[in-house]
Amino acid sequence: MLTVWPEASIAGPINPSPWYAFEADIHSSDPVKLRLDYAGYWHRYFPWISRDNGASWQKLGEDAVTVGDDGHIATVTLPGGPDSLLVAGRPLITPADMSVWSRALVERYGMQRVTYGESLDGRPLEALTIGPDTASRIVIALTGQHPPEQSGVAAFEVFAETLMAEVPAETLADTRFVLLPLVNPDGRARGNWRHNNGGLDLNRDWLNQSQPAIKAVTRYLSQEAEGRDVVAFLDFHSTQKTLVYTPPFEEAYADMSFPQALKNAFDAGIEPAPEWIAGHNAEAGTSKNWALQTLDVAGLTVELGDDAPPAEIESIGRLSAHAVINFLSRTAGE
């Protein structure tokens, strides 16, 4: 039996995201049963396996997992074989993987890779940027605040790749794009459920700014946004199902033109269309609330379902990029 237990928390109960990853030395031709004990938490992430050290992943069949009536214990049947297996709640996307992806994007599209700070563990915090210093507008997108949220990272990558491949030169001439692919490298490197190494959920620290990663990112984004019209602010995450958290549409303190354009794109291009939830955690220290209060932009949290299929992930990322491009083109000169 393995006990799946969260990292230390200094701010109350941790979000129930019982993430796990481990290596299993089977060395048997027969299947092996393993129990995952979540103690006071519940089974959430279906296991995937890799036989090639994470280069490729296969989701176990539905009959390979049995969850107890109370959800606290899951019995997993692992296939036999001569070699060891990696087992994880989602296919792993490590900081090294994300660094390789970032480097490729920078090289392909002539972006700049900017180190804007250092995490609590001393890891570099990086942004990918493109667009002239004289640009009057800016688009900001980020991901990687919560370690297990792989589908959100995947959608962000589609968004970034589509944006860079398709943004017109005339739009790029007056728009700066700032992309943050990994806000919480410590949590991801340590395999945490939710927090950084300081025991805090970084997406509740944007107003207090008690953690080095959030101090650095808020300072950097404020500098990038100074004197510019912040057109869009997107933060990609994962949760139980695909949805979008947004400021209240009916309140006039933020321009909701881009959120409405994105909603229209999702409604027309995805079936069923994602739910939009206005005013969620309106007082919490989330990135979207910081963006609203500090940058005067309606920050959006785009949540992908934990088990969103590749086609849905691709659609969310691509449609988000197209919505940004179309909105920038339509509002140029305003």
Region annotations inferred by a language model:
Residues 1-81:
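Extreme N-terminal flexible tails
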Residues 11-13, 115-119, 290-292:
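Short Gly/Pro-enriched turn/cap motifs at secondary-structure boundaries
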Residues 63, 111-114, 326-331:
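Well-ordered mid-protein domain cores that form the structural environment of catalytic cofactors
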Residues 92, 203, 244-252, 278-334:
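Active-site-adjacent mobile loop/cap segments within catalytic or ligand-binding domains
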Residues 112-130, 135-276, 299-306:
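Active-site/substrate-binding loop(s) of hydrolase catalytic cores
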